Amino acid sequence: MSRTVFCQNLNKEAEGLGFQLYPGEIGKRIFDNISKEAWTIWQKKQTMLINEKKMNMMNVDDRAFLEAAMVAYLFEGKEPEIEGYVPPSK
């Protein structure tokens, strides 16, 4: 049976992640409070951000920017700024 969490991003009970996908304290926080559905949505936005801003994941500054955008999106509900992208209305 899969575990459920109260997803802070979607504000509902949903299936949790199978294991901690991100290292450290932020990873633990994501594992405990973010659903599989919300993580999948974030991964799509993350890909758009990386491509739009031509980020290099070997660059420390790019990784720090992406981590800040991830925390802002998952826990504060802030949409990342992706040029030309209009989020679907709820």
Swiss-Prot record:
GO terms for cellular component: cytosol. It comes from the Bacteria. InterPro entries: Fe_traffick_prot_YggX, Fe_traffick_prot_YggX_sf. Keywords: Iron. One of its GO terms (molecular function) is iron ion binding. It holds the Pfam family Iron_traffic. GO terms for biological process: cellular response to oxidative stress. Could be a mediator in iron transactions between iron acquisition and iron-requiring processes, such as synthesis and/or repair of Fe-S clusters in biosynthetic enzymes. PANTHER family: FE(2+)-TRAFFICKING PROTEIN-RELATED. Belongs to the Fe(2+)-trafficking protein family. This is Probable Fe(2+)-trafficking protein.
